[in-house]
C-alpha cells in the first residue's frame, strides 16, 4: 500500500510505519455549531533533508524561518494508492530530536469551514435588505398578498396582525361584521428564506436543499418586531425639514393689504427642501404628525418716511383660514424708515392633512390716502424654516420603508440560523470537495434508504461486535419550547400551563434512562385569537389592562401595544369560511392576509407549534355552521418524532464493529447513505481511526434503522371533546373570552 502526504503542494518523505489515523463523525452534521471536521491523531514525519526544506529549516532555533510559516493554515492531503482519503489542513506542532535523529510532529485536520463560527457575532442588522425598500401604500400592501414570496417573490408580505391598532375588532359582535382597515394598520414582514439566503451568502457559503426551497418553507415570514409601532428613522425625520428663501428678488406689500409671502427658493445651499414644501403654491404639508418649530425671518423697509405709525405683521396661516401672528414691528411717526431684520418662532402641532403658509400685512395709521402710495418691501434675505421639536414620530403612510433601519430585529445571525436548525431538526453537511457548499435537509429527508452502501463483505467478523441498547444512554425527557413572547395571551397561557404556547414535552418509556434534553427556539410563537362568533382569527400581539363594556353590551378590551419579540409565522391569503367582510381602503375582500402558526386556521394541514396547544382562543363559527379544525401535524411529529424514537424505542440500538475499509470506501463515504450489513440497515455514526497506512480493519459505530410506522397526521374538529386525546396529546380547551 502506497501512502502519500502532501503539505502546501509538496510531497513529504514518510517512514514505512507511519501512523495516519482519520476519524469521521455524524456529530458534525447533527450539531453544526460544534463541527470539528475530519481529524487525525498527531503523526510523526522523519527529519529528512527534503522535509527540512518543506518546513523551512524551522528546527534551527538559531536561525530565522525561511519560507514556511507555522502560524498560517496550509493545505494538506493524503493519497492511498492514488486515491484521496483526506483533504484539509496541516499544523506543525513540534520538532523533536534525540541528538541523532529529528522528527516533525504534525496534526492533520479536516477543512473545518464552520458556517456558525464564520458568522461570529454578526447580527441580522448587519445584512443589507435595501432592495426591499418600498413605499408604504395600499397598492404595495394588496400586491404583497398575492405576489409575495409565495408566488413570484417580493420577499415581503403585509399580514393582518393585531399589534393593538384601533382598527382591529375585539368585540363579540354577530357575523357578518366587517373589520375596516387602512394602510396604517399593516406593517411589512420579510420571508424567512430571504433572511436565510442573506446569512448564508453573506458568509461566503452556498446551499442545496429541497426543504429550504420548498413552497411551504417559502411561506414562512418574520413579522415586524422592532417596536410596538413603527417610528420614523432619523433620515426620514430630516427629510421633513426645510429652509426656504424669498423668491423673485424683492416683494412689495401695499398699505392695507394681506399677502402671501413668496417663500419659494430651495436652492442653492444653504436652502433645501426635504420634500414637504410646495414651491409652486408656497405652502408646507408635513409628511408625519408632530410638533414643529416654524421660524420666519424677514428684512423689511417702508418706501416712505412718514409722520404716521407704519406697522408690519407676519403670520403663519394654517389650512387657508387660521392666522397666527408671529412677528409685529412699527416704525413710529417721525422716527424714520430704516430697514429692519425681524424674526419670530412659533410652535405648532401639524398633521399630514394640514398645510401652512407665511402671510404679511402692512398698514399706515394715516386716516386718509397718501400719495405716493406707501408700501413695505421685503428684501431677498428673507427666510423661512421648520424644525421638529422633539421625540420620534410614528411613520405615516406614504413614507418609504427603510427595511434596514425599521424592520430588521437585532438578533445574531448564528442564533437565527440555529433556531431554524432546532425547529426543523436540520442536518447540515458540507460538500467533501467544496466545504463552503452545504447540503441541508431535515432528519426526515436527510437519508436515502434506497441508496445504501453494502458493507456486508467488509465486516471483520473475527473482531466481534458490540450491541448497546440506546434507551438508558439517552435522556428520558425531551422538551421543545418557543421563547415566551410577552403579550397578554402568551402570559395567560404561560400562567395556566407553566410552558410557552405550542411547546411539547416527550417522555420516553425507558425506566433506566434519566436526564432531560431541551431544544429551545428563540422565536416567539403566535397566539391566534378570534372573538366568537366572528370568523376573524388573527395573531394578536398586545398587552391588556382590563375589560370594559361598550354600548350595546359588546365586550371591549383596553389594549396597549408591546414590543414584540422575534417571531415566525406561516402566511397565506385565504378565504373566510363563512359570510363576512374584510375591508381595506374602502374595498371589500372575501379573503384576508392571514399569518399564524397554522397554514390555515379553519382547515389546517401543518402547524408551527411543537405540540397541540392546551388552549385555543377561538372556536368554530356555530352561527354559520362552519366547523373549524386543528391538526397534530406539528413540528415535533413532522421533524423530531422518528429521530427521538431512534434513541428511545425498545428496539433502538447502537452497534460497534470492525470493517475492512479501502481508500475507495473512504472516498465514497457519505453520511446520507445508510450502511447495509447482513440484511439490516444502519445509519453511520462514526468511522474511528481509519489508518491510511495499515491493512487493519477499522472501528465504526452504527445506529439501527428502525422500521417505524409512518406518522399519520390527524385533523380533528374544534367542537367540544375536552379530555379526549389525539394520539398522545390532549385536545385543546376552547376559550371564548
Q: Where are the regions that the model predicts?
A:
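Extracellular jelly-roll beta-sandwich "head" domains, especially the C-terminal globular C1q domain
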Residues: 234-396
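Short coil-to-beta transition motif at edge beta-strands of beta-rich domains
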Residues: 67-78, 664-677
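Short, charged beta-turn/beta-strand-edge "cap" motif at the junction between a beta-strand
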Residues: 82, 362-364, 680-683
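Short, structured beta-strand/loop micro-motifs enriched in basic residues and often containing a Trp
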Residues: 55-57, 652-661
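Viral virion structural and adsorption modules
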Residues: 711-737
Amino acid at each position: 500500500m502506497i501512502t502519500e502526504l502532501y503539505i502546501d503542494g509538496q510531497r513529504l518523505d514518510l517512514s514505512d510505519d507511519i501512523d495516519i489515523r482519520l476519524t469521521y463523525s455524524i456529530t458534525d452534521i447533527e450539531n453544526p455549531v460544534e463541527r470539528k471536521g475530519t481529524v487525525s491523531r498527531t503523526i510523526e514525519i522523519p527529519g529528512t533533508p527534503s522535509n527540512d526544506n518543506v518546513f523551512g529549516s524551522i528546527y534551527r532555533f538559531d536561525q530565522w524561518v525561511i519560507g514556511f510559516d507555522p502560524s498560517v493554515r496550509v493545505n494538506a492531503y493524503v493519497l492511498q494508492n492514488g486515491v484521496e482519503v483526506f483533504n484539509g489542513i496541516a499544523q506543525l506542532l513540534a520538532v523533536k530530536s534525540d541528538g541523532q535523529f529529528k522528527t516533525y510532529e504534525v496534526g492533520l485536520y479536516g477543512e473545518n469551514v464552520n458556517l456558525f463560527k464564520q458568522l461570529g457575532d454578526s447580527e441580522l442588522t448587519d445584512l443589507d435588505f435595501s432592495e426591499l425598500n418600498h413605499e408604504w401604500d395600499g397598492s404595495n400592501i394588496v400586491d404583497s398578498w398575492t405576489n409575495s414570496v409565495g408566488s413570484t417573490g417580493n420577499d415581503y408580505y403585509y399580514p393582518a396582525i393585531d399589534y393593538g391598532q384601533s382598527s382591529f375588532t375585539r368585540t363579540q359582535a354577530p357575523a357578518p361584521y366587517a373589520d375596516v382597515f387602512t394602510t396604517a394598520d399593516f406593517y411589512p414582514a420579510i420571508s424567512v428564506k430571504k433572511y436565510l439566503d442573506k446569512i448564508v451568502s453573506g458568509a461566503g457559503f452556498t446551499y442545496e436543499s429541497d426543504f429550504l426551497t420548498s413552497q411551504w418553507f417559502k411561506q414562512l415570514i418574520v413579522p415586524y418586531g422592532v417596536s410596538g409601532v413603527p417610528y420614523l428613522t432619523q433620515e426620514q425625520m430630516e427629510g421633513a425639514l426645510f429652509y426656504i428663501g424669498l423668491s423673485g428678488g424683492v416683494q412689495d406689500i401695499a398699505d392695507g393689504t394681506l399677502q402671501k409671502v413668496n417663500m419659494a427658493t430651495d436652492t442653492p445651499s444653504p436652502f433645501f427642501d426635504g420634500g414637504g414644501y410646495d414651491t409652486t403654491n408656497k405652502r408646507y404639508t408635513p409628511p408625519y404628525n408632530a410638533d414643529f418649530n416654524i421660524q420666519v425671518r424677514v428684512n423689511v423697509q417702508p418706501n416712505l418716511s412718514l409722520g404716521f405709525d407704519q406697522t408690519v405683521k407676519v403670520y403663519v396661516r394654517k389650512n387657508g383660514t387660521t392666522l397666527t401672528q408671529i412677528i409685529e414691528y412699527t416704525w413710529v411717526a417721525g422716527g424714520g424708515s430704516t430697514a429692519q431684520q425681524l424674526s419670530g418662532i412659533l410652535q405648532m402641532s401639524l398633521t399630514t392633512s394640514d398645510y401652512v403658509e407665511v402671510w404679511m400685512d402692512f398698514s399706515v395709521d394715516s386716516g386718509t390716502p397718501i400719495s405716493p402710495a406707501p408700501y413695505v418691501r421685503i428684501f431677498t434675505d428673507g427666510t423661512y424654516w421648520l424644525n421638529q421639536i422633539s421625540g420620534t414620530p410614528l411613520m405615516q403612510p406614504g413614507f418609504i420603508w427603510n427595511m434596514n433601519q425599521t424592520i430588521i430585529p437585532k438578533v445574531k445571525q448564528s442564533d437565527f440560523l440555529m433556531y431554524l436548525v432546532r425547529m426543523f431538526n436540520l442536518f447540515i453537511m458540507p460538500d467533501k470537495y467544496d466545504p463552503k457548499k452545504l447540503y441541508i435537509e431535515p432528519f426526515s429527508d436527510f437519508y436515502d434508504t434506497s441508496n445504501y452502501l453494502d458493507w456486508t463483505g467488509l465486516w471483520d467478523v473475527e473482531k466481534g461486535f458490540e450491541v448497546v441498547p440506546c434507551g438508558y444512554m439517552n435522556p428520558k425527557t425531551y422538551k421543545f419550547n418557543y421563547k415566551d413572547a410577552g403579550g397578554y395571551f402568551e402570559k395567560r397561557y404561560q400562567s395556566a400551563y407553566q410552558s410557552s404556547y405550542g411547546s411539547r414535552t416527550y417522555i420516553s418509556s425507558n425506566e433506566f434512562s434519566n436526564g432531560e434534553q431541551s431544544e429551545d427556539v428563540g422565536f416567539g410563537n403566535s397566539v391566534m385569537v378570534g372573538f366568537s362568533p366572528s370568523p376573524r382569527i388573527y395573531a394578536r400581539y398586545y398587552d391588556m389592562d382590563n375589560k370594559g363594556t361598550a354600548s350595546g353590551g359588546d365586550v371591549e378590551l383596553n389594549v396597549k401595544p408591546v414590543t414584540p419579540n422575534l417571531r415566525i409565522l406561516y402566511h397565506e391569503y385565504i378565504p373566510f369560511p363563512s359570510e363576512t367582510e374584510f375591508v381595506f381602503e374602502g374595498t371589500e375582500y372575501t379573503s384576508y392576509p392571514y399569518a399564524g402558526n397554522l397554514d390555515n386556521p379553519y382547515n389546517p394541514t401543518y402547524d408551527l407549534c411543537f405540540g397541540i396547544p392546551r388552549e385555543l382562543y377561538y372556536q368554530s363559527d356555530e352561527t354559520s355552521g362552519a366547523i373549524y379544525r386543528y391538526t397534530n401535524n406539528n413540528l415535533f411529529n413532522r421533524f423530531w418524532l422518528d429521530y427521538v424514537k431512534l434513541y428511545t424505542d425498545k428496539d433502538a440500538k447502537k452497534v460497534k464493529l470492525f470493517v475492512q475499509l479501502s481508500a475507495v470506501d473512504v472516498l465514497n463515504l457519505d453520511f446520507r447513505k445508510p450502511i447495509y450489513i447482513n440484511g439490516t440497515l444502519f445509519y453511520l455514526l462514526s468511522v474511528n481511526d481509519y489508518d491510511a497506512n495499515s491493512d487493519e480493519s477499522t472501528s465504526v459505530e452504527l445506529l439501527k434503522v428502525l422500521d417505524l410506522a409512518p406518522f399519520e397526521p390527524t385533523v380533528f374538529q374544534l367542537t367540544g371533546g375536552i379530555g379526549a386525546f389525539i394520539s398522545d396529546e390532549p385536545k385543546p380547551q376552547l376559550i371564548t373570552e
